[in-house]
Amino acid sequence: MSGVWVFNNGVIRLVENPNQSGGVSTQSHGRRNVLVYLPTGEAVSSYSSLEQILRSLGWERYFSGDSDLIQYHKRSSIDLISLPRDFSKFNSVYMYDIVVKNPNSFHVRDFN
């Protein structure tokens, strides 16, 4: 069984396979998340815009044998950012990974 358990008015039910959309992570109850670049307030809407921002922060593309991933590394650290090649699979897990590795530059916000 996969899905999300929802408790509402004393009743618990399983909602199977909640929908997700690219670049915007859909949480239970219709909440969506976006990755925001703090200096400009811009919501990241594509990998090309994200790559420009990451490059300006010192991140470089890391080419590995995995064709399903886009990866970035920083020479000054051991950190590696791994993202799905398909932007429609970019969700809050990947967003928070970017935030943890760039805490003063990115933030995940609810978007309704």
UniProtKB/Swiss-Prot annotation:
Transmembrane segments: none
Gene Ontology BP term (one): regulation of flower development
Tissue specificity of this protein: Expressed in leaves and in some parts of the flowers, mainly in the sepals.
UniProt cross-references to InterPro entries, sorted A to Z: FPF1 (IPR039274)
Stretch forming the signal peptide: none
Family membership noted in the UniProt record: Belongs to the FPF1 family.
Misc. remarks from the entry: Overexpression of FLP2 results in shortening of the time to flowering.
Function, as annotated: Modulates the competence to flowering of apical meristems.
PANTHER family cross-referenced by the UniProt entry: FLOWERING-PROMOTING FACTOR 1-LIKE PROTEIN 1
Full protein name: Flowering-promoting factor 1-like protein 2
Naturally occurring in which organism (per UniProt): Arabidopsis thaliana
Gene: FLP2
